[in-house]
Amino acid sequence: MAEFEDQLVFNSISARALKAYFTAKINEMVDELVTRKCPQKKKSQAKKPEVRIPVDLVKSSFVKKFGLCNYGGILISLINSLVENNFFTKNGKLDDTGKKELVLTDVEKRILNTIDKSSPLYIDISDVKVLAARLKRSATQFNFNGHTYHLENDKIEDLINQLVKDESIQLDEKSSIKDSMYVIPDELIDVLKTRLFRSPQVKDNIISRTRLYDYFTRVTKRDESSIYVILKDPRIASILSLETVKMGAFMYTKHSMLTNAISSRVDRYSKKFQESFYEDIAEFVKENERVNVSRVVECLTVPNITISSNTE
């Protein structure tokens, strides 16, 4: 009986010790979760249908090479896939055919001829989307209701006035209080989406003149996506541990490498740049310019002078 009582006491002590142990562990876990500030999950959004690029707006030699002439429209994902699978080596580097047939700037060609293919600066599959996007060109005009409208960045006011004159869009006098509001039909929205790759922002087929002006400004703006960028100062390469190549008086690095290096300096939970990074770039980026990664990239680089080759 005494032995049984001793066993009960032993079990009782073990239970209390075990309870205290687990309680302490649970408290530690809760504290860690509270201080960690777990990032919120993004709300899942319905996937938008992919826009088809009209065949006449895709580089003609590319269309012929892959037999796309009879397509009603070419998905950009198909262009991406064809570029990735036909113009790169097994090691993921741009091959000689790609250098000849894809759209490269003169600077890009000079850099590729200067560096070794094994260099991290060499164009690789991470640049597929940029190269694929260059195979499509912006429309210079669109047709609607028997009228042809020309797209010129410095003549957008004339374009809107012509749309009104032709009654392709109509002034909504009731809604026009602070700004002129126009009724834009679904048929015209479809034409713009197909030819210009994006739709204007409308609500119940109503759009303001300001929004319409901004829309045409964006779609007529030249795409200046770059694979290589010029650093404002050689010290930037040291701060961010970037590979570089010097061409004349300019020091180049890959845009993707610079973006990734800056992104790695963003705190995962606070979404702000690390304080040490602020100190390192203070000379090049003003405090009010540290808005996001894209803005910092702009501040650390010199605008490229783009001269394209292989365009049609």
Swiss-Prot record:
One of the record's GO cellular component terms: virion component
Name-wise, this protein is: Telomere-binding protein OPG077
Family membership, please give it: Belongs to the orthopoxvirus OPG077 family.
Q: Which InterPro entries match?
A: Poxvirus_I1
- What does the UniProt induction comment state? Expressed in the late phase of the viral replicative cycle.
Q: What does this protein do?
A: DNA-binding protein which binds to the hairpin form of the viral telomeric sequence. Required for the production of mature virions (MV).
Indicate where this protein is primarily found. virion
Classify the source by domain of life.
Viruses
Q: Give each disulfide bond as a residue pair.
A: none
Sorted alphabetically, which keywords does the UniProt record give? DNA-binding, Virion
Species of origin reads Monkeypox virus (strain Zaire-96-I-16) (MPX)
Q: What else does the entry mention about this protein?
A: Each virion contains approximately 670 molecules of OPG077.
Tagged with keyword DNA-binding = yes
As one GO molecular function, the record gives: DNA binding
High-level lineage:
Viruses, Varidnaviria, Bamfordvirae, Nucleocytoviricota, Pokkesviricetes
**Locations listed in the record:** Virion
